[in-house]
Each structure stands twice: as structure tokens, then as C-alpha cells.
Amino acid sequence: MERPISSVHFEYVALFILCTTVFASATTSQHQESQSRQHKEASYLKMVVNATELPMEEYYDYIIVGGGTAGCPLAATLSQSFRVLVLERGGVGSGNPNLMNQEGFLTNLLNAETEDSPAQAFISEEGVPNARGRVLGGSSAINAGFYSRAHRDFFDRSGLPWDLTLVNQSYQWVEKEIVFRPKLKTWQSAVRDGLLEAGVTPYNGFTLDHAKGTKIGGSTFDGSGRRHTSADLLRYARPSNIKVAVYATVERLLLAGSSAIGALYRDQRGRHHHAFLREHGEVILSAGAIGSPQLLLLSGIGPRPYLSSWGIPVAHHLPYVGHFLYDNPRNGITILPSLPLDHSLIQVVGITDSGAYIEAASNVVPFISPRHNAFVRSPLYLTVATLISKISGPLSAGFLRLASTDVDANPRVRFNYFDNLVDLERCVNGTRKIAEILRSRALKDFKFSNWFGEQDFRFIGPALPLHQTDFPRMANFCRRTVSTIWHYHGGCVVGRVVDPHLKVIGMDSLRIVDGSVFSVSPGTNPQATLMMLGRYFGFKIITERNDYK
């Protein structure tokens, strides 16, 4: 099983492993469906303004910092009853063909180093590359589009008093607008069959629910390959009650004693604006697991000694801001298949009973020979296929620290991958399951034959150890090949930074509604639950205000 391909230019293949992108072809009817969706999108774009067009001072009932995966459905819901301002540091993605179509997914991540790119790159202290959203729609506008609801244990362990009826209604509110059933092609179908051969049963077919076994999940790419993001949910907003400001960089929260009273933000021209709260209003952070704890610290909310060391005036001592930061490690293998494959995103998932989720993707990546040839101006293209293991949880926790008092600078993050041995055991379980899938009849056709008639896979990068029963070797493989699946969360977790209503502990008029409050990743992919969270808490806040009256 260990036959790496040394002749492949690894830089380009590593880029594929990082991006796990997907493409698809369109039919005429699917194109018409996509065109129909584009007409709908114009309605929410009427609510979007460049921050340069806003007054230098204005008052709102709710100021939402971050127009991302949770922020957009939250804003749409609150606008039904209140005046809402959304402050998004990035721009609008709907006019960017690279962003809104599957074909441009790789390009967006390649350009993640530029100042205004939709994806902002960062690297953990362990050296693992990662990315965060910087565009209206947030990470839902730059991800691989997989949609699946949270596992039941997530709700039991989250520390929140969930109304599960409202949870289900909130999921459905999202799904009727932006979730689609994908069509499986060669690689995804083979992996589905391989999972079943490897004992990841039962087969649950197409379902958005989290269920042990093998299933087909939802996708936020429609049949023509067009992306739908949380920004699409702004179509539910009341236009007269909402302003969505793009290129609006919040530098700090405005505080008066123990209360939030607004936000200070900067537009593209460098001018500062003040957004203030009306009576009984709230500032709601939806800037994500990197942005929300960073903004709290820059606003003087966090550990007193740490803030003082940066010369930041302490507004409120809250010792656990930036702590309990998690990232689900990803491990797996990449092969050169022996036959051509269609592009595919993550559509099939195997939910094992040993703490690992198995997923797959296939793609075409550019290959340029290290030896430049004057007669070859264009790169060749290789079809590659991956099998990926993501662990549940995780239990290993890290931290976030400031790297600068400039809000545009990425903070320092460390996730402490596999510090908890349970995480390491789950990774070994997942990689062993990948080995079983590789041995299945379903994947036999993807092997190459040698001169002696023997068949084997050709791996790009590290292959699995030959002796999969050897735990130390498998554990070393996990540590050596660790990467991210972009499901980082925490930093403002429930019970430490926010209370069960997601209000910042010890503060008034300040709440956090995003993945930074989670201490466990919801199911196989968090985006469904983050969108649900925005809708759910928008409804809850309206109910609270009505009760208050």
C-alpha cells in the first residue's frame, strides 16, 4: 500500500489537499434554476451599502458585527421587528464568478494572501495553514458546501437550554432556501460503497440528519454548480429595517461602564464611524472563532493582566476570552486514480462509532514539472482523489492571543492538536477505517497494475503505514500529516465567556452568536448549525423583547 509518487510536483498537490475543491457540469434546466436564483439575489443586494455611504453617527436597535454564516440569518430575523445594522469587513461575493461557482473555489484560496480577498489565510503556531472568511456570507462563501445537521449529543453538551422544536424549524428555514441534493458520480459512489463494505452501516441514503452509518448529505451548491451562502438568507429581511454595510472594519466596541453602547468602525477611506444603540438594544458579535475573541480583547474585555501587558485599558476582567479554542484535525490520503474521475465535492460521509467521520473528494490539479521546458508553456493536469478522516470533538484545546493591536492583523492561534490522547485514538480509528475502504472491492478499479499483474494504489504524499495494527506508527502518521478541515471553534465558550443566553458574562447589551461559543463541533460539518443558530437566536431575542414589553 506504500507507493508514493515522487515525480509529482508536491506543491501543487498539497494545494489540492488544502483546498479540497470541487467542480460540476450543468444541464440546461439546472442553468435555468441558477438564473432564477440570481434574480432573487437582487432583492438582498438592495440592502447592501458600502460603509463609506453611511453617516458618521447613527442609532440602531441591533448592531451585528460580522455578516457571516450566523450573522446573516440573525440579521434577517431581527429586522422583522427592529432596526438592524450589519457591519461586514469584507465585500460582496455575488458578483465574483470565482467565488460563486465551484470552478473558482481553488482560485479564491490561492489568493487568500491579498488584502481584500474573500478568504484570509492564517497559520497556527503548529504550522498548520488555515483560512477564515472575509466576505458577506463569511465562511459559507468560501467552503466546500457540505450541509449536515448537528448530532444529538451536541445539543446535550452545549450548555444551552435548546428548544428543539425551534431548532428544527430554524434548520428548515435555512434548508428551503439554500440546500440541495447532490448527484453522486464515480468517486463519491465508489466511496459510498467502500464505506458500506468496511462496515460503516447502515446506509441512510440522502438525509440532512446526523445518523450513524453512511449517508449522502446536502450541498449549498445547486445543480448548476452555483454557490448559495448565508447571505442569500438576507432575502428574508425587512428592507426598511436593515442596512448591511460592507468594507466596514470594526476596530473596537464602544462601552460605558459594564454596558455596550455601540461600535467604532472604519470604512475603506479610513474614516471612522460611530454606530450607537437605541434603548434596550444590543451589540451582537458574529465575527467567528477568530474575530469575536479578538474584538473582545481589543475592546478591553478579557484577562486583566494580559490586557495590561498590551497597554489596553481594561473595561471588564473576563479571564477565559481566547481560551478553549478548538480545531478538528484532518488526516487522510491522496491517490492518483487509474481512470478519469469527475470533479466532486464532499457529498458522502461515513459516520463511524469510533469517533471519526470519513469523507472524500476528487479533483483535477495543475502539475508543472520541476524541469522547465521551453516548449511546454501550459501545465499538465492530474486527476487526484482523497479520503479524509475528521475526528469528532475534539477534546484538545488551545488558545488565541493578540499578535497586534491592529484588528486587521491575524491573532496568534494554537490548537494543540492531539494533546488529548482520546483525539489521537480517534484519528487512528479513522485512518484504519480509510485503510479498510482502500481494501474494499468498490475501490479496486482505481488501482494500477504492475508488470507482474499485481495491483496497488499510487499515493501522492504520505501513504498509510503498512502495519495498521501498530498503534505508535499510526499515531505518528496522525501527528505527521495533521491538517485542518476548517471547523475551528471556541474562544468564547458557554459558561466561561457567555451565559446560556449567549450574553457576555458581566456585561449588559453584549451578546455573541457564532461558532466561538461552541466547545464541540456540531456533527460532520458546522455550517448548517451556525446558520440555524443565527435564525434561532434572532427569534429568541425577539421573544425576549416582546416579553420585556
Question: Which residue stretches match the model-derived regions?
Answer:
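Redox-cofactor-proximal catalytic regions of oxidoreductases
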Residues: G104-E197, R226, L387-D408, R412
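Extreme N-terminal leader/targeting segments of oxidoreductases
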Residues: E2-D61, Q80, K540-Y548
